[in-house]
A protein has these predicted regions:
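Glycine-rich beta-strand-to-loop/alpha-helix junction loops that act as flexible
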Residues: 199-202
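RNA-binding accessory domains that recognize and position tRNA/RNA substrates
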Residues: 1-187, 191-192
Length: 202
């Protein structure tokens, strides 16, 4: 329960909701999922794309409290632990069509505000995502090394909100990687003498 604000966006994936929710690219956004069922295969920690849930709220058609995958845990408990508000029984395809026709906009999920006028006022006061500096909220705070230290090639990764799968793909290519915070000076990165540089999405 509570209020959750953010830019409303959507994802049409049939699976992978945990990866979507933990993707730093979606930081602070309200996620609309067009897949009919969300939560039916639970949550596995190893499938998270970052250390936290990045969406600010979930809007879905059917939310499943039951799940059927060995070793998984409840999406409901996962969202509750991360203080993420979700709303279900929504015609998400109609919402997606509205977003497509009207463009990016802020929205709110609320269990507390009963006045439409108050909701409209608070939405008007909520900052638009365009132009916001968000890299500092999703980037690593300290540099770290991953991969094979005996690799022939070293790659410096600038973290603007990188997903775990991108790092895994670089590691699978055989690179030794050092991940740097978004605001690291180039001269500091050069001290490691990397063979290549990778600037993440975010």
């Amino acid at each position: 329960s509570g209020n959750s604000y953010g830019e409303i966006c959507f994802n049409t994936g049939m699976t992978g909701y945990q990866e979507i929710f933990t993707d730093p690219s979606y930081h602070g956004q309200l996620m609309v999922t067009t897949n009919s069922h969300i939560g039916n295969y639970g949550i596995l920690n190893q499938e998270a794309q970052s250390q936290k849930v990045n969406i600010s709220g979930l809007i879905c058609k059917n939310f499943s409290y039951e799940f059927s995958r060995p070793g998984a845990s409840s999406l409901y408990e996962y969202l509750k632990a991360n203080q993420i508000i979700a709303i279900s029984d929504i015609d998400t395809r109609a919402v997606v069509n509205y977003i497509r026709e009207n463009g990016a906009m802020n929205a709110v999920i609320s269990t507390q505000i009963k006045s439409i006028d108050k909701i409209e006022k608070e939405l008007k006061d909520f900052p638009k995502m365009e132009g916001l500096e968000l890299a500092s909220k999703v980037s690593t705070k300290k540099s770290y090394l991953i991969g094979n230290p005996d690799s022939k090639y070293k790659v410096a990764v600038i973290d603007l909100g990188i997903k775990k799968n991108i790092l895994n793909n670089l590691i699978n290519k055989g690179f030794y990687i050092q991940v740097y915070p978004y605001d690291t000076e180039f001269s500091e990165i050069q001290k490691w003498s990397p063979h290549g540089y990778f600037i993440s999405n975010g």
